[in-house]
Swiss-Prot record:
It comes from Salmonella paratyphi A (strain AKU_12601). ATP binds at R100, N101, E102, N109, E244, L245, G300. This is Elongation factor P--(R)-beta-lysine ligase. The gene is epmA. Homodimer. Pfam families: tRNA-synt_2 (PF00152). The lineage of its organism: Bacteria, Pseudomonadati, Pseudomonadota, Gammaproteobacteria, Enterobacterales.
């Protein structure tokens, strides 16, 4: 919308009314399917270890904590929701605030609304179908198409991301005029992400949503490794009209393997001069107690609303972006 006094909302009132209707529609979608809505904390004593995520940190000083207790604003409700799953809650969803101390712009705000849900006994593909159902209902769009990560690279960059070495990845980056970044980057996954962002994303999801699945095993995060091809993880992302909408996993249930991944993340953080993050022992204990076989997905609601309304920026669908907060 046009420039307004900063006390006023960035989004128009008609857009906020439409946003409210979409939130109601999302809740109805899950109620009709018997999925329980839950609420979990916005703060935790532990946080994500992913080298590409930057959480906000605060400090609690109160009874029993006179020396203070570090707390982190949640980048996603994932860890707490998995603890509920391990406790036997069944299928769950949540609409909540999440926080990331990163960029701000047309498609980013440090505080944003997340839709996250988990389906016991669903594999990755069944959950992808449910995500597709939700997108068609909210966006009135065509059914999505699906491409493996490998197929997407081969189609748009003519390179195999699962076998290419760093020299080949840098050569692909040079064709995109990205040598100034790629030539000094030693982390293979960062090179792959650079190529995906600049060489694949602009070409997918133009007319209909596109699922990209089977990311490299080195990018598994909290997903299982495929039993059919150990080079890839049971992980997917969804793109539509130039926007990343969602990220989903066939969830890892092995506590020991998850701890090893967290520790590996922290080693990568140390190598980059980033602070090592406290590992969530409660999550690991929940996995050890028995997380049911399940798949889960996190979807950016503000971006979904932006697409539904044909808006140009998140500022058009959020009442008060961070510069007006």
């Amino acid at each position: 919308m046009s420039e307004t006094a900063t006390w006023q909302p960035s989004a128009s009132i008609p857009n906020l009314l439409k946003r409210a209707a979409i939130m109601t529609e999302i809740r109805r979608f899950f109620a009709d399917r018997g999925v329980l809505e839950v609420e979990t904390p916005c703060m935790s004593q532990a946080t994500v270890t992913d080298i590409h995520l930057f959480p906000f940190e605060t400090r609690f000083v109160g009874p029993g904590h006179s020396q203070g207790m570090n707390l982190y604003l949640m980048t996603s409700p994932e860890y707490h929701m998995k603890r509920l799953l391990a406790a036997g809650c069944g299928p769950v969803f949540q609409l909540c605030r999440s926080f990331r101390n990163e960029e701000m712009g047309r498609h980013h705000n440090p505080e944003f609304t997340m839709l996250e849900w988990y389906r016991p006994h669903y594999d990755m593909y069944r959950l992808m179908n449910e995500v597709d159902d939700l997108l068609q209902q909210v966006l009135d769009c065509q059914p999505a198409e699906s491409l493996s990560y490998q197929q997407a690279f081969q189609r748009h960059l003519e390179i195999d991301p699962l076998s290419a070495d760093k020299t080949q990845l840098r050569e692909a980056a040079a064709k995109l005029d990205l040598s100034n970044i790629a030539d000094t980057e030693e982390d293979r996954d960062t090179l792959l992400q650079l190529l995906f962002t600049m060489g694949v994303e602009p070409h997918i999801g133009k007319e209909k949503p596109t699922f990209i699945y089977h990311f490299p095993a080195s990018q598994a995060s909290l997903a299982q490794i495929s039993t059919e091809d150990h080079r890839v993880a049971e992980r997917f992302e969804v793109y539509y009209k130039g926007i990343e909408l969602a990220n989903g996993f066939h969830e890892l249930t092995d506590a020991r393997e998850q701890q090893q991944r967290f520790e590996q993340d922290n080693r990568k953080r140390a190598a980059r001069g980033l602070p090592q993050q406290p590992i969530d022992q409660n999550l690991l204990d929940a996995l050890a107690a028995g997380l049911p076989d399940c798949s889960g997905v996190a979807l950016g609601v503000d971006r979904l609303v932006m697409l539904a309304l044909g808006a140009e920026s998140l500022a058009d669908v959020i009442a008060f972006t961070v510069d007006r907060a």
